[in-house]
């Protein structure tokens, strides 16, 4: 077996696999298997909880442990979530689906088999549209095929060096519901693979069927990678296992492409194997030779009846489906006049999109761009700085809309609005919808719009800054900005900037 690895430091040949779809004369072929935990409160075949982070082996029931005499009972919520996903990827739905046993031995698989769907999956062929290199000059759309998606139970987890250098087994995860999403081998680069994975990740969180927290293992990716000369038969594939970071996914695929090219260019043969990516050494290496499906001896599970889904159930789920990201993004551009960039940011998650639309519902569609600027720039910026999600925002959509309304009616200038926003973020106005009004009143942040009052301040500034006035009259435009700054300083930022500019120009001639 050739177990050669390739890193940036020790590669004999360097291959630029970042952008090209053909690398050193080879075509890259990638297929993805995604294991996504479904967010039910109990497991797929037992009543045990699915909470993350508890003491090892504290959330495994007798069903999960495979003790004699127990029988699995299918969780109906798992079926509903799988149907949502199938509808979301435009797939054929398996209204008749069955469960099978996948037989293999591993310490974290207590029954000696995994319950899965081999013969009749709940989701058949579908597709998802993605944008590769999104936001970059070389972005392009592509439709990625989905072969199938099936339900199965998760295995436990081996915990290495848990006790005195030994490996322990934590079965809390055993029996957690999974939907395994199998793509067509449609990806031709790491960029395309990453775009597909991100699109699936966004979809499952958008639909509310999974939290998809990669760091907790609830969204894991296996990448099947092969290379071939254009027009040749598919090459031998290797499987990069359990990748749980967007950054590592792209790097791992590129390193595996390099490794396979090196093997073939040296006259060797790629061996079908399961690969590990080592991020510290930035290399892939063989974990074990890859099993074929026959090695698992699949057969129907005798303890679980076939699942028959009525069409009215599908119709009910379809009717309750939310507007999907692509459609919502298009509507933001067409109906609200937002740029492609703004629409993409504001549909980054369903929660962000909902928040934004709630603000627009209060201020009106005509001011959607102003709402977008405040949500994207100020609010998301503050939340990102504090490592918070939009659901943790200390400013409600109605509170932000209330502040924007005061900008619209000239109660607030842009500068004063920043102060009000900061106070809202610190919850100084409380939980009431009119918190912005309370802050404006308590802090005296109302914009001065009385022409007479502003004119008096301007006249005083002109009198005290004769040199700057002469510079302006001598043709130095920067001096005018200096005078505006002096007026704003004298008014403590409360004077209406437009009125200040107008009055200054009138008095200076």
Curated annotation (Swiss-Prot):
Subunit field text: Heterotrimer of A, B and C subunits.
Protein name: Aspartyl/glutamyl-tRNA(Asn/Gln) amidotransferase subunit B
Source species of the chain: Psychrobacter cryohalolentis (strain ATCC BAA-1226 / DSM 17306 / VKM B-2378 / K5)
Catalytic activity: L-glutamyl-tRNA(Gln) + L-glutamine + ATP + H2O = L-glutaminyl-tRNA(Gln) + L-glutamate + ADP + phosphate + H(+); L-aspartyl-tRNA(Asn) + L-glutamine + ATP + H2O = L-asparaginyl-tRNA(Asn) + L-glutamate + ADP + phosphate + 2 H(+)
Family of this protein: Belongs to the GatB/GatE family. GatB subfamily.
InterPro entries documented for this protein: Asn/Gln-tRNA_amidoTrfase_suB/E, Asn/Gln-tRNA_Trfase_suB/E_cat, Asn/Gln_amidotransferase, Asn/Gln_tRNA_amidoTrase-B-like, GatB, GatB_C_1, GatB_Yqey_C_2, Gln-tRNA_amidoTrfase_suB_CS
Gene3D superfamilies the record matches: 1.10.10.410, GatB domain, N-terminal subdomain (1.10.150.380)
Functional description taken from the UniProt entry: Allows the formation of correctly charged Asn-tRNA(Asn) or Gln-tRNA(Gln) through the transamidation of misacylated Asp-tRNA(Asn) or Glu-tRNA(Gln) in organisms which lack either or both of asparaginyl-tRNA or glutaminyl-tRNA synthetases. The reaction takes place in the presence of glutamine and ATP through an activated phospho-Asp-tRNA(Asn) or phospho-Glu-tRNA(Gln).
E.C. number: 6.3.5.-
Broad class of enzyme this protein falls into: ligase
One record GO biological process: glutaminyl-tRNAGln biosynthesis via transamidation
An MF annotation (GO) of this entry: glutaminyl-tRNA synthase (glutamine-hydrolyzing) activity
Keyword Nucleotide-binding carried by entry: yes
Keyword entries, A-Z: ATP-binding, Ligase, Nucleotide-binding, Protein biosynthesis
